[in-house]
Amino acid sequence: MKLRSTIIFTLLLSTSFFAQKKSIDDFVLKGYSILDKSSGDLNQDGYTDYIVILRNNLDTISADTARPLLIIHGQQNGTYKLAGRNDSIVLCKACGGVFGDPYSAITIKDNYFSVEFYGGSNWRWSRVITFKYNTITKSYILHKDAGESFNAFEPDKIEYESYHKELWNKIPFKTYSAD
């Protein structure tokens, strides 16, 4: 009985050891590559966390393929853990109009991260979607989704837009859609 318990314990230990990811690249899905990544201490635990945006390797300018956004938390033992994934936040490559790919940047500050977009033609627009890590619930929620737009011939006449304001500080990261 003791030998059997030792074998089971060893198998469980080795399985969990090999399941841990030691590199951000270990989270890249088959057929995808990293479009962008940014690091910071999102969950305020003292370890480096990452926001990673993936792109489909077969993505073309006209494609409307998903661009997964991954939240990856650094762990005490030097490994990484997937804390969240959402395929509906990063706008498609063709969604930027004449400007092409609207994706602009990821920014991280404290326990917030934002995904920034810019696009348009004569009518230009920007959009910033921000999420906040809630240290009590240990989850990410939508903090703000807003942007601005202007006509290229009248750049001083800026219009401000709030998207899904009724969901701010309520909807979880995993279920939010930028549509």
Predicted regions: what they are:
Residues 20-32, 77-100:
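Blade-edge motifs of beta-propeller repeat domains
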Residues 27-28, 58-65, 119-122:
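Short consensus segments that form the blades of beta-propeller domains
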